[in-house]
Amino acid sequence: MQTVLDGKSLITAAMLAGTLPRGKLEHHGEAFETARAELALILHATQQQIEQDKTPAEIVGRLLSFLNGLHSKVHPDVWHALIPVAQNHPILKYFLEDPLTHWSFTKPRGYSGDAQLLDYIYCDPHVAESVANASEIGKALYSHTQNVPSCVAARERRDLLTRYVDEIAVKNGPQTEILAIAAGHLREANRSVALTEGRLKRWVALDQDPQSVGLIARDFQGTAVEAIDGSVRTVLTRGHKLGKFDFIYASGLYDYLAHNVAVKLTKTCLQMLKPNGTFLFANYAEGTPDAGYRETFMDWVLLLRSEVDMWNIVNASVDRNTVEARVFFGENRNVLYAVIEKRG
């Protein structure tokens, strides 16, 4: 089933690239040639390591480190031009043996960062068979890639969402209503005590991928979870009469949204909160050390943000006199969170 994209929700790297400011590469001619030469050396050295049968962990660990070094020092326009150079190198085939890298690069659902990719990152039982069927090299690579800092941060993010839901349910009682936007497979619900004990009125899971919506409906049948097919546009246009909520969150979505769309979505979500309700959004942070590998060999480009960027979204969306707001890093500083609590 081909997923229909609306340009405002989960999107492909090419679509995301259209939202990013890009200069002309000719302005960086010499810098590009220097960077391309450095990348060629990195790729050649990696190929030699593969031919010498070095361990997959050593090979991918070294590549991650060198790509991060290059990514962090070149201009974004130069880096963007280097991505296809890396992707067209013969060593790509080796790294595609890793089920996580393979799923991300080939995009079976037609877009980046889909829910099954997150299942690989979560080491979820739903992908255990796929991992078991990988080659020995693939399994060894996966043992490393699943534990890069951004993946560790994604698992922490999942567990943080569960804690927020359970704490808000304790505070508000059995009438608690939750909304997850771009819910994916809603894995954070698997460990929710409030859901298991029937202490939620409803947990609405909105996603634009029909496969994800179907899986949620199947896995959480008979619970307070309601799976709904819808996108950012659905929320912005109030396409569904969703009602009001105690807690709304968008944990893996803002990484794909330009500032103006992020502000519109934040404003809309705040209008959908009950008095004293809470809105949370998360975003991968600038400086994530695996961005170089992710953007090349995983073909997964994210809009990384700083603390200032997060505050800019918050401040453009609210009257700070009417809310309590905070921005904070996760434990390994790879993910940023913004939490806005509505006063009264």
Question: Residue locations for each model-derived region?
Answer:
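Class I (Rossmann-like) S-adenosyl-L-methionine-dependent methyltransferase catalytic domain
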Residues: Q2-D77, V85-H89, H144-I168, N172-T176, ...
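Class I SAM-dependent methyltransferase Rossmann-like catalytic core
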Residues: P84-G173
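Conserved beta-strand/loop positions that form the S-adenosyl-L-methionine
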Residues: I181
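A short acidic, Gly/Pro-enriched loop at the edge of an enzyme's catalytic core
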Residues: T237-I248
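A short beta-strand submotif of the Rossmann-like class I SAM-dependent methyltransferase core
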Residues: A250-L253
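Helix-to-beta-strand junctions that scaffold the AdoMet/dcAdoMet cofactor pocket
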Residues: L257-A258, L273-P275
